[in-house]
Amino acid sequence: MAAGCCGVKKQKLSSSPPSGSGGGGGASSSSHCSGESQCRAGELGLGGAGTRLNGLGGLSGGGGSGGGGGCPLSPPQGCGGGGGGGGGGGSGSGGGGISLSPPLSCGVGTLLSTPAAATASSPSSSSSSPGSRKMVVSAEMCCFCFDVLYCHLYGYQQPRTPRFTNEPYPLFVTWKIGRDKRLRGCIGTFSAMNLHSGLREYTLTSALKDSRFPPMTRDELPRLFCSVSLLTNFEDVCDYLDWEVGVHGIRIEFINEKGSKRTATYLPEVAKEQGWDHIQTIDSLLRKGGYKAPITNEFRKTIKLTRYRSEKMTLSYAEYLAHRQHHHFQNGIGHPLPPYNHYS
């Protein structure tokens, strides 16, 4: 199932808990269940493909990306026209009981000072053991997203299959714009997708079909930041406080005042960026999921909560161009840089 990662544009919660909340709501170090095995269901089975979420747990517009041959980023000889994925605005929220709410800032993640110093941001890395697996997310994934968007906006054939791993992951693609890094689009999926097709699809879906924003244009390219988030370590927990701000993303399921099942999610960086504690985050997520009744502690205890982690990489457009200068061959073909006068 797909989701959104973000929340309110330029909106901050007060330091006090939202209306209807209890106190400050610190994290609980242990579950309210009788045993660890009861509280954590371990790896979750991921839902079927196709449903897209916008980071808030709200349904996004549909649409996929185009297919394609090789695509240099300027009009070289032999580069065919056409190509690209879907356009148009997003559709309203629909089945699955997920509502779309005003967007919240998704986190910018780790920006790269130079392509050679590219590092990924992972909330789980600080607590990983020395033998933990190598990070999967890479700067090349963000470059591929920029390639896909550029080729779509200029009508070139889509880039060939990239060289990075094609393992399946739940994923999100987030776009921000300008010096203040305003949210410009954020859509992803909780269904594990092969990275080559998943990033190609959600690059265009998040850029063109996030129903909170108009489709992106060529003029916006130079001011964009692209983030790729790969979601990992899904765990069911019994206690709605059993997660760590800034480390875990959370996905909640609840029954609203009309008896309908609803879901909503925030990526790991959202609560930390907004300065929220556990209670504020849960209450905000309930509102984003469409819950309108007063929020009591008794109701919070009925929430089914899944926590997860993510690996995240962020690249600015300028860093993307610099990366391409140092990597002249991308996806197995020559990859000239786009003319700078396109963006002056």
UniProtKB/Swiss-Prot annotation:
Domain AMMECR1: 130-324
Region (Disordered): 1-39
Localization terms from the record: Nucleus
Positions of post-translational Phosphoserine modification: 16
Record's compositionally biased regions (Low complexity): 28-37
Gene3D superfamilies documented for this protein: Hypothetical protein ph0010, domain 1 (3.30.700.20)
UniProt signal peptide: none
Primary localization: nucleus
InterPro entries recorded: AMMECR1, AMMECR1_dom_sf, AMMECR1_domain, AMMECR1_N
Annotated Gene Ontology cellular component terms: mitochondrion; nucleoplasm; nucleus
Keywords: Nucleus, Phosphoprotein
Pfam families registered for this protein in UniProt: AMMECR1 (PF01871)
PANTHER family xrefs: AMMECR1 HOMOLOG, NUCLEAR PROTEIN AMMECR1
Designated name of the protein: Nuclear protein AMMECR1
Organism annotation: Mus musculus (Mouse)
